[in-house]
């Protein structure tokens, strides 16, 4: 299963994706069977996930390169070639021809939009539909808004999460999130693993840990 985390810029996609990767690794750590799993950056200009997951290494967060059709096709080919059972990819934030190209291999998408740009979720839904990509989850991220994180519809994986700054993630990883958001990310990780292990739509996870 190839799943992309996408949505408008400044929505907390990088920290969310890095936290989701950590949660999947944690879920698998003590299991006798390890589901083949990897992650793949799709944005040629941004290497944030690698920088967040490897804070002690000398990883450049930004790359001084331009998006071109050729580079997008190269990224799509690399994404398509990944043969692990579960591949998590982070997408660029702007809907462009290049974005549509790199999304082509995806089976599903998690759409994440900040509170001020919730209306742009519809645009991402349309991109997903045009590429025959299932919407696995839709999340609104908040930073300073006076709203509480939590599920609106658990079975559809729709809800609100609290965003964090990259510096907070660098210091504490996924534990930098509030308890509710941290639990929601772990539940999404569990759903993805269940989906890949059973090859059918997972039942909602009711666990709180």
PLM regions and their residue ranges:
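Switch II (G3) loop of P-loop NTPases
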Residues: 63, 81-96
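Conserved catalytic-core segment of NTP-binding enzymes
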Residues: 93-177
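NTP-dependent small-molecule kinase module
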Residues: 157-208
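Flexible, charged surface loops at secondary-structure boundaries
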Residues: 30-33, 77-84, 101-105
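Short beta-strand-centered segment that lines the nucleotide-binding/catalytic pocket of NTP-utilizing
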Residues: 27-48
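Conserved NTP-binding/hydrolysis module of P-loop NTPases
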Residues: 50-67
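Glycine-rich phosphate-binding P-loop
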Residues: 3-26
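Residue-level preference for the first positions of well-ordered beta-strands
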Residues: 2-4, 36, 84-88
């Amino acid at each position: 299963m190839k799943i992309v985390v996408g949505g408008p810029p400044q929505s907390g996609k990088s920290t969310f994706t890095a936290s989701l990767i950590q949660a999947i690794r944690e879920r698998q750590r003590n299991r006798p069977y390890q589901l083949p799993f990897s992650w793949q950056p799709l944005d040629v200009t941004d290497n944030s996930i690698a920088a967040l997951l490897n804070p002690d290494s000398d990883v450049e967060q930004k790359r001084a390169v331009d998006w071109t059709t050729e580079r997008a096709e190269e990224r799509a080919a690399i994404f398509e070639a990944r043969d692990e059972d579960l591949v998590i990819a982070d997408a660029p934030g702007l809907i462009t021809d290049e974005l549509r190209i790199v999304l082509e291999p995806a089976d599903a998408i998690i759409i994440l939009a900040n509170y001020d740009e919730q209306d742009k979720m519809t645009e991402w839904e349309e991109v997903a539909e045009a590429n025959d990509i299932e919407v696995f989850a839709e999340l609104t991220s908040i930073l300073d808004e006076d709203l509480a994180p939590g599920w609106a519809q658990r079975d559809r994986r729709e809800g609100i999460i609290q965003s964090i700054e990259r510096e907070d993630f660098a210091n504490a990883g996924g534990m930098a999130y509030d308890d509710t958001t941290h639990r929601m990310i772990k539940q999404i990780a569990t759903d993805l693993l269940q989906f890949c292990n059973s090859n059918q739509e997972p039942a909602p996870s009711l666990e709180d840990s």
